[in-house]
Amino acid sequence: MKVFTHDVSICNGCYNCQIACKDEHVANDWTPIAKPQPDTGQFWLKLSENVRGQVPRVKIAYYPVMCNHCDNAPCMEACKVKGAIYKRKKDGLVIIDPTKCTGCRSCVDACPYGVIYFNEDLNLAQKCTGCAHLLDSGWKEPRCVDACPTLALKFVEESEAKDFIAKAEYLKPERAAKDGVRVHYQNLPKRFIAGTVYDPVEKEVVIGASVTLAAKGGKKTYSAKTDGFGDFEFEKLPVGQFTLTIKDGKKSKEIKVSTDKDVSLGDIPLT
């Protein structure tokens, strides 16, 4: 069966995937796979923009949010009409049959990922279909994947993605294994701590200062040196409490930092 993979590190936020999805499904009736997607209010694939940090250290990451086409789909379990939601054996795509859906909304409420929408005008639930109608006509991949210029988003056989899946991350990691999600990510945004060290007396940045970041409880320690601009940065940090220590010769400074959010410490005087 097929899986979707997305490498956040090479996604440039072009929105081609989101636009291609709209182009394929708005005003187009692909019954029995899907009725038309509304112009507004629904994004069967929504590109999430994650902005974090504080000026001047701001990072932006993009990743698609779509149906996970779960092997143990909560929506299928919640559906009250036999066969209205089914999983295709040949590719693993989960489909809401628009000819059988009665509009009870049970699947909308059951989806823990918030990716099933309700079409008030048509009185039916709708979501990503993986462009199953195109695959059935000979396409190798959905429109969103076909439109991705950086190959960040792929639709491949599960066996081909074994190495990717082994290191994969998930938007809801606590549910991924239980639901058997078939959308796998790598390099999802994590916390960072950054700053610029300077000497207030010399009025110059401090180059080559030793910067150590110690997790509370001594679980892990990270180290770095300030660069030619006096900058340092620690990336891919877990959420937690840390002690940041900066040393240069006899001068030192200690700062308590929490990664409940990304932290840009700005200019740090070393005295």
Language-model-detected regions and their locations in the chain:
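Short, acidic Ser/Thr/Gly-rich low-complexity loop/linker segments typical of extracellular
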Residues: G217-D231
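A short, solvent-exposed beta-strand micro-motif common in secreted/extracellular proteins
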Residues: G230, P238-G249
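Short, ordered, surface-exposed loop/turn motifs in non-cytosolic proteins
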Residues: R191-I193, P200-G217
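Long, compositionally biased charged/polar accessory segments in the mid-to-C-terminal portions
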Residues: C144-R191
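Structured interaction patches on ligand/partner-binding surfaces of diverse proteins
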Residues: G249-T271
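Iron-sulfur cluster-binding cysteine motifs and their immediate structural context
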Residues: N16-A34, N72-T99, S106-N123, K140-A161
